Amino acid sequence: MLLNDIHISKDNIPAFQANWQEAMGICRERDIREVVVGGDLFFSRAAQTLDVLLAVRDMLVSAADHDIHVTLAEGNHDKVNQESLRGYCHVFDRHPNVTVVDEYLTLCRPEWKFALHVMSYFPEDGSFAERLGRLAAEALSGKPEHFLYIHEGINGALAQPSEKELPARIFSPFDKVFVGHYHNRTVIPGTGIEYIGSSRQHNFGEDEEKGYTVLYTDGTYEFVKNRVNMRYRVMDMPAERAGLHLMDELREMEADGRYKVKVRVHAPAAAMKSVDKAALLEAGAAKVELVADDEQLPEAVSSSLFEKFDSRRIRETYEDFCREKQIEDVSMGLEYLSRIENRSCGN
């Protein structure tokens, strides 16, 4: 079984435990004895609390109790120094049923029709490509199919590409590439590269296709959807449909207990006062956002096209955006932005 981007933190331990227990249940049902966590077991790069470390310890003990071996690859959130071979997962590398990946390793069993090469995270604009080349030179041979499991950003996975992302062509020696890091499932067109999705939803910006990838001995694989964790759903509604029927639907989802719902109500600015935001919240919406169909960009963000943005200015603009959109958890975005060097963007 492959799973990634579990992101345990002091604020989500019950969700993490439910996530892992579901994974263990699937392993028991299907007699799976090997689990690979492909990066970002942890959320905070700065430090881990005792509660977090004990929850991970209990997770690994529960796997051992069911005779399941766990391979942990370090993700970018699992390291303080992104180029280091060792991260937080290495705290657990002496557990008898645990292997922690330093740089890369290969998993292969006599009954498998493939070899699974697992790599820890290294910066896309740093040493990753060199390390991948070394893996390909050392481990690839003609006989089994060669699968790769990594935790990286690859060009073509997101709607807006980044210069920092890796080019897809460097993965051509591999028959199949499974990837963590970006949380939504997607296949890069024209390649064998597939983002398998995080093990559960973390916020409203992610879709509901989250869970686990089961690799069979013949090299085929199956996505198994997470059923136990909270779902984050965004409902876009015109103002005329934001009445009793919508409230009944919200009450049903609240009674189900598995959904947090953000309602985005679209209406002309003049009609916004007719939307009963309080009633929608009372009916079970976690958030209600009013979107004016004819709204203009706020003055605060309509800066000159030629304005220079350094890292401080970008962070301030991001925080303003989150306040405007009522986004509570800004820490992950700020963590990514903190890597931007303190220099102007543009020409």
Where are these regions (language model features)?
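A conserved active-site cap/scaffold subdomain adjacent to cofactor or substrate pockets
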Residues: 180-239
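Accessory, non-catalytic peripheral segments of nucleic-acid enzymes
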Residues: 217-347
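Active-site regions of enzymes building and remodeling cell-envelope glycoconjugates
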Residues: 97-99, 113, 191-195, 221, ...
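Domain-start "cap" segments at the beginnings of catalytic or binding domains
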Residues: 1-13, 102-105, 210, 219-229
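Conserved beta-strand elements of the Class I
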Residues: 1, 115-117, 213, 231
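N-terminal active-site segment of His-dependent metallophosphoesterases
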Residues: 1-59, 131, 135-144, 339, ...
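His/Asp/Glu-rich metal-coordinating catalytic cores
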Residues: 34, 46-194, 203
